[in-house]
């Protein structure tokens, strides 16, 4: 038995040494080719880019650059995979070699050996010694080479005349419901809807995110501690078209605490008509095309917040905009981040002097230019969504922010929870606290639901059910009505009708007028913490378990 074990160990030693020799040589050859792929230094690519400078509208040339770039990237990642896999294989072989060689040495005295070491010819002993030394020397050299000069991608060079997609048109954007509370975050549609239930369908996973709609598709997100998914339903009949999991190479870390009021899928997705984008409380953000194919996914790190993460995504052209307000202001963790919608790569990020918040950012148009409006503690801040540059700020908000800001005529209205309502002229630069605050009321403000503006009136709904109509020019209350329910869902406006949905699932249809007038009520039959969505003459509502469609 000892003889057999000795022979097996000896065979393993020889085989692992030969394997180390072969793989080490392959890695040395791979490294001698220089930095991987010529991704940036390719003369052919550089020449094509020079030509593109001269002919920026040459589509055939752009396509040629795109194809060459793909080939270079494939070659680059092929070399990277070879180096990484080879290094791992060498490490495994080295462990086997050392273990088996040690076993041979220990067994040597006991194992029957017709020719002892001292009985060998001196020439044979020298050959054996130098062979073993060569194997270990080559393995050490290869390991040292990889440690000192690892295979790396070249640093990212500035993109010159990058081929881009056709920009999304504002007409398409405005004809759909692509983001939280609609096109411009105001929760309004010009079309009226009827509280006539057309259908309801089960939603596969829980979530507090609201639906978004583009064309004939309704998108939502859902998650539990085991998986996170994006769903696509037929807007006409509610059929589930696809349900796709977010796939990453490594599991993402869950937040230390999960709040029941937010969970893992509280942020509402956003869509640009090509892809739908979703973010989850563990920091996973992903893009899917309209067929359900995952285009890209990445992790931003666990989004730790006292009440969970709930800021919905915003979008402008090819920028996916994410408000990350985390921890306390002193932690310096908060920022606004823009990702390339095509690739998920960072485009810009701007630090924020704020602590944790739960409000969602909104895009508004001011003087024909877009502004990204955000609420934080204590700042109401506006950014250029293209560059990330801060445009203006007002000190006037507070902690535990959940309501999102809106544009009411020419004023941005934001809420300081349970305290102030603030209206700001969004035309200044820098800190405009002393110059651009149009009015402020201090009689209390809603804690969770966001407000709505009908062109003449400003409506506020508190979490405890107090509905107020205010003068948007002064903030003065005109009338108030207690709906005697609790609310998380934001107010919405369909035509001339206010829609308010209580946490118990009671829908209130109220006339948007100079006096309170209840038009109709409808009970969903299940809890609801999401906001209503409109498309055409239909309204979509996500309940605790089902997606509902109302209309005609």
Predicted regions and their residues:
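Alpha-helical transmembrane signal-anchor/signal-peptide segments
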Residues: 30-48, 151-163
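Cytosolic-side transmembrane helix boundary signature
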Residues: 1-8, 97-132
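Low-complexity, acidic polar-rich segments
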Residues: 41-80
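Noncatalytic, solvent-exposed loop/strand surfaces
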Residues: 147-552
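Juxtamembrane/start-of-transmembrane alpha-helix segments at the extracytoplasmic/lumenal side
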Residues: 76-91, 125-129
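Selective detector of the "anchor" transmembrane alpha-helix that sits immediately C-terminal
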Residues: 16-22, 83-109, 211
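Internal/C-terminal transmembrane anchor helices
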Residues: 121-152
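Hydrophobic membrane-insertion alpha-helices, especially the h-region
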Residues: 11-27, 133-144
């Amino acid at each position: 038995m000892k003889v057999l074990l000795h022979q097996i160990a000896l065979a393993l030693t020889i085989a692992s040494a030969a394997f180390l020799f072969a793989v080490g040589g392959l890695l040395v050859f791979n490294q001698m080719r220089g930095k991987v792929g010529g991704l940036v230094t390719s003369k052919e690519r550089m020449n094509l880019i020079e030509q593109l400078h001269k002919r920026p509208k040459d589509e055939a040339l752009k396509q040629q650059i795109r194809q060459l770039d793909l080939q270079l990237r494939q070659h680059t990642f092929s070399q990277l995979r070879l180096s990484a896999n080879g290094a791992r294989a060498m490490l495994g072989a080295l462990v086997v070699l050392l273990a088996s060689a040690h076993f041979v040495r220990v067994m040597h005295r006991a194992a029957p050996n017709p020719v002892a070491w001292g009985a060998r010819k001196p020439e044979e002993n020298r050959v054996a010694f130098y062979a073993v030394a060569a194997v270990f020397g080559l393995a050490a050299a290869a390991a040292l080479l990889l440690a000192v000069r690892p295979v790396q991608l070249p640093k990212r060079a500035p993109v010159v005349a990058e081929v881009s997609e056709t920009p999304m048109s504002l007409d398409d954007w405005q004809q759909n419901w692509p983001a939280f509370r609609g096109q411009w975050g105001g929760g309004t549609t010009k079309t009226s809807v009827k509280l006539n239930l057309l259908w309801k369908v089960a939603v596969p996973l829980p979530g507090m995110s609201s639906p978004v709609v583009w064309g004939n598709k309704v998108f939502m997100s859902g998650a539990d501690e085991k998986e996170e998914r994006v769903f696509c339903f037929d807007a006409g009949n509610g059929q589930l078209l696809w349900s796709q999991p977010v796939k990453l190479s490594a599991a993402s870390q869950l937040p230390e605490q999960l709040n029941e009021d937010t969970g893992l899928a509280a942020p509402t997705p956003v869509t640009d008509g090509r892809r739908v984008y979703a973010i989850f409380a563990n920091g996973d953000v992903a893009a899917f095309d309209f067929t359900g194919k995952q285009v890209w996914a990445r992790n931003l790190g666990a989004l730790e917040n006292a009440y969970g993460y709930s800021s919905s995504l915003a979008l402008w052209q090819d920028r996916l905009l994410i408000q990350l307000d985390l921890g306390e202001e002193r932690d310096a963790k908060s920022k606004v981040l823009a990702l390339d919608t095509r690739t998920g790569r960072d485009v810009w990020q701007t630090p924020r002097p704020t602590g944790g918040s739960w409000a969602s950012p909104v895009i508004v148009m001011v003087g024909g230019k877009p502004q990204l409006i955000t609420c934080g503690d204590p700042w109401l801040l506006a950014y250029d969504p293209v560059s990330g540059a801060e445009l203006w700020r007002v000190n006037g908000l507070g902690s535990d922010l959940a309501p999102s800001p809106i544009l009411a005529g020419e004023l941005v209205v934001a809420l300081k929870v349970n305290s102030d309502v603030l209206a700001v002229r969004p035309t200044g630069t820098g800190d405009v606290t002393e110059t651009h605050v149009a009015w402020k009321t201090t009689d209390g403000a809603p804690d969770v639901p966001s407000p709505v503006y009908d062109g003449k009136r400003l409506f506020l709904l508190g979490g405890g059910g107090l509905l107020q109509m205010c003068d948007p020019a002064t903030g003065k209350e005109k009338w108030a009505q207690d709906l005697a329910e609790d609310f998380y869902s934001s107010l919405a406006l369909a035509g001339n009708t206010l829609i308010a949905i209580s946490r118990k699932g009671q829908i209130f249809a109220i006339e948007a007028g100079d006096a309170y007038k209840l038009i109709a009520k409808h009970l969903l039959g299940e809890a609801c913490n999401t906001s209503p969505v409109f498309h055409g003459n239909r309204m979509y509502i996500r309940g605790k378990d089902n997606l509902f469609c109302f209309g005609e």
